From Swiss-Prot:
One Pfam family from the record: Ribosomal_S20p
Organism: Histophilus somni (strain 2336)
Record field: compositional bias (Basic residues): 1-11
Xref: InterPro entries: Ribosomal_bS20, Ribosomal_bS20_sf
UniProt name for this protein: Small ribosomal subunit protein bS20
Keywords: Ribonucleoprotein, Ribosomal protein, RNA-binding, rRNA-binding
Summary of the function given for this chain in its UniProt record: Binds directly to 16S ribosomal RNA.
Length: 87
């Protein structure tokens, strides 16, 4: 454990950030899973609505640096292609 006051403060801040980031990452994954589930139902309207919500969340996480921009693009393009296939 840290002995210097500033190091203790940094440890506390780091733990707080870790917990917040974990929460945000979990929320993002939930939106992605909901979108995959909506695509699996085969209803294009529902899937499209879920995709729009997921896209907002993924873009926000990428802009904040929680995930890489390319990872966000991969999620969006993969799901967009699946939604496009739906009749």
């Amino acid at each position: 454990m840290a002995n210097i006051k500033s190091a203790k403060k940094r440890a506390v801040q780091s733990e707080k950030r870790r917990q917040h980031n974990a929460s945000q990452r979990s929320m993002m994954r939930t939106f992605i899973k909901k979108t995959y589930a909506a695509v699996a139902t085969g209803d294009k309207a529902v899937a499209q609505a879920a995709f729009v919500e997921m896209q907002k969340v993924v873009d926000r996480m990428a802009s904040k640096g929680l995930i890489h921009a390319n990872k966000a693009a991969n999620h969006k393009s993969k799901l967009a292609a699946q939604i496009k296939k739906l009749a």
